[in-house]
Amino acid sequence: MDLARSSIKLFIANIFGAGLQFLGITFFARELGASQMGVFFLFQALLGIVAIPADFGLRGAVEKRISEGIQPGEYLSSAIILKLIPISLIILSIVVFEQRINGYLGGDFAVYLALAIILQETAQLAVSVLKGELRVGETAELNIIRRITWVGGGFLLVSSGLDAEALIYSLLAGMVVTLAWGLSKISTSLKKPSFKNARSLFNYSKYSVVSSIGGYFYSWMDVAIIGIFLTQSHVGAYETAWRVTAITMLFSQAVASTIFPQVSQWSSKNEQQQIESVISNSITPSMLLVIPAFFGILVFSDEIMGIVFGSEFTIASYVLIILAGEKILQSVHVIIGRSLQALNQPGLAARATVISVVLNLILNVILILSFGIVGAAVATALSFAVNTVLHAHYLSSFVSIKFQYSQIGWCTVSSLIMAGVLFGFKTLVGVNSLIQLFIGIFFGMLVYTTITLLYQPIRETAFKNLIRLVPI
């Protein structure tokens, strides 16, 4: 598998999908307002939380075992049987607590939550199989199709007069399309399941689920707690800020998704030197976009939240800055965390995750009650910093982690210069409209890219990967 080419292919697809999703969220936020957006985000948060026991880490286990190339069909069949048990229990629980769930969400959406968990788990299992088959690049089109369905369907339904339910209906439609497309793509055939394969999956998933808990807690626990203590408008503003900063992680996530199956394969062959090389060479590209994004958001946070989404979203301007800074840590964590799991060390990843999850939960309750949604952002950043340090410590016990400090430093200097230029643009020209904001962002990107490419090692790596992307 060509790591650079797969990463860039996935990144390009993610850019398109994220751009489409950003336009969708912008339209929905302007049409529905922060409160209705909050209802939808709470639905997604609850879906993310119930997905933890519904999956129990099996998707990660399937990707790991299939990537090893031994009895993939048997592992897939065993995984399907294992997943039926927790999914059935989750659906039963949703039925029992339907009224309470509807009250929390602010509408009669519990039945759609049950349907969503079924569709999501089956669709994501198909995606995990593709990744395990070392066909990560092919998952790019699945993400695009899912987002096109959500945005397109949501646009039509919102335009017809529906509120938050429009976004939920289109979300379900996107899952259906992803499932159908994914099933048509995978080449692994179902074989007779076995207790041995099921036990192997469980032995991996019992640790992988803890890392999954960390991921879901990181993505949704702050939103869920905000929904308990604050208003749906706060939920809508906070999660919108989160979605903006998530765009900066697109390339980092593409790189991390690509290296996992490859590192897993090398690990099974004890090719440590290649593993160390790919980890070192992946960290800098992973940070390439998040560093300038933080400095750009530092200058334009009020304008992004107010001009793009509306004045009621400006309550999350400081949240936007804090979460953008946190993404710098996440860009390192996604590489280190996925590498640790690929080395078949889910237990250590689980240990780090448990510590950070407990810290995240405690800090969120304390800081949200004290500082509102800004406290939620601080809690997330602090707990994730601890998580990253612990993962790095555990990974360093098996392989050498080398940071390319000169390249990272050059990106930081380039970002500082860009921020100075943007501040001058904001002061002299002013940013009072979408056009002015987009011009400022484009100008900042141009300045950063130009200065960054002046550094020869970065320039040579960028051009080499660009050439590898183009088929000959």
Swiss-Prot record:
Keywords: Cell membrane, Membrane, Transmembrane, Transmembrane helix. It is a multi-pass membrane protein. CDD domains: MATE_Wzx_like. It is found in: Cell membrane. GO terms for biological process: protein glycosylation; S-layer organization. It comes from the Archaea. The keyword Hydrolase does not apply. It holds the Pfam family Polysacc_synt_3. The chain crosses the membrane at residues 8-28, 38-58, 77-97, 109-129, 164-184, 209-229, 244-264, 289-309, 315-335, 354-374, 375-395, 408-428, 434-454. Belongs to the AglR/Agl15 family. This is Probable low-salt glycan biosynthesis flippase Agl15. It comes from Haloferax volcanii (strain ATCC 29605 / DSM 3757 / JCM 8879 / NBRC 14742 / NCIMB 2012 / VKM B-1768 / DS2) (Halobacterium volcanii). The lineage of its organism: Archaea, Methanobacteriati, Methanobacteriota, Stenosarchaea group, Halobacteria. The gene is agl15.
